[in-house]
Amino acid sequence: MAKKNDPLFTSFFIELYPEFYQKLKTVQPNLTLVEQKVCFYLKLKFTTKEIAECTFVSVKAIQNRKNRLRKRLYIETDVDIYIWIDQL
C-alpha cells in the first residue's frame, strides 16, 4: 500500500499508529499532508530513495522535505531523523 502511494495509506497508517500520529500532531499541529506522509514513511524506515520512488518525486525533493521537516519539528542537525521519529 505504501509503495504504491495508495490514497488509503494515510488513514491506514493512522489506524495502525494512532499514538505516533497524536504525538506528531502535538509537536507540530500544522504539518501538511505531504509532510505527514514523509513522517509516516520515515517511521516505517523507508530510505530517501524508497520514499522518492513511492511518491513519484526526485530524491532531491525528498531530501529537501526532510530538511524542512527538521526545521518544522525542531530536530537538531546532529540528530538522526529516523531515530527521532522512532522515539516519538
Model-flagged regions — what are they?
Residues 3, 7-88:
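Cytosolic nucleotide-binding catalytic cores of signal-transduction proteins
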